[in-house]
Amino acid sequence: MAGHSQFKNIMHRKGAQDAKRAKKFNKLAREITVSAKAGLPDPASNPRLRAAIQAARAENMPKDRIERAIKQGTPGADGANYEEVRYEGYGPGGVALIVEALTDNRNRTASEVRTAFTKFGGTLGETNSVSFMFNRIGQVVYPASVADADTVLEAAIEAGADDVQSDEGGHYISTAVDSLGEVRDALETRFGPPESAKLTWQPQNTVPVAAEDAAQSLMKLLDMLDDNDDVQTVLGNFDIPQDLLDKLNG
């Protein structure tokens, strides 16, 4: 089991154990605020804001919390000014990791991310030190319940998508960067709003992590990064065997 759904499953395990709902809402709110500031505070004319709101709704974020986050992104509103930063490095087992963050203090976030990498046997590198191992793509995600794999594949290809991967975790539809909005709109007409629609990083190849100690350290690193308020997403090229993942989750 590799890629997007594997990290999602690891985070689901953690969320079920630790009840990090408030922290998740904080991260979603920050993305909404930054998206509103980056363009117009109207989701109809701001694709990024629209996607951020859809992601928040998919997590059952309260409507008033969403509206408050949008207002904080309007011109003249008080609040912190966040900037987008990306960190790259190697985690346990030699896997490549890309960490995307929204921060109001670059030095603080860099220090905390570096500490997490170092604590669990990883190494934080320079910008572009591992991103060349990934392709920048658009990705639209729907829950598995929206339709069967064949139906989603047919609709996605017709909409102009490049690829679809379906499993018990959902349908992951890949697009060219410039086609994300067009594909999302076509699929939304067919299936309703997606869980998410955003640019992401797709590994060109995966690195197997079969040693239990390395896999455990990697999961702890992912947990620590996810605990950081500034970190929005973590992408990796790891592939942990399903039986080992089940054992560690147990």
From Swiss-Prot:
It comes from Rhodospirillum centenum (strain ATCC 51521 / SW). HAMAP family: Transcrip_reg_TACO1 (MF_00693). It is found in: Cytoplasm. InterPro entries: Integrase-like_N (IPR017856), TACO1_YebC-like_2nd/3rd_dom (IPR048300), TACO1_YebC_N (IPR049083), Transcrip_reg_TACO1-like (IPR002876), Transcrip_reg_TACO1-like_dom3 (IPR026564), YebC-like (IPR029072). One of its GO terms (molecular function) is DNA binding. Keywords: Cytoplasm, DNA-binding, Transcription, Transcription regulation. Belongs to the TACO1 family. GO terms for cellular component: cytosol. Residues 1-21 are annotated as: Disordered. Its main location: cytoplasm. One of its GO terms (biological process) is regulation of DNA-templated transcription. This is Probable transcriptional regulatory protein RC1_1808. Signal peptide: none annotated.
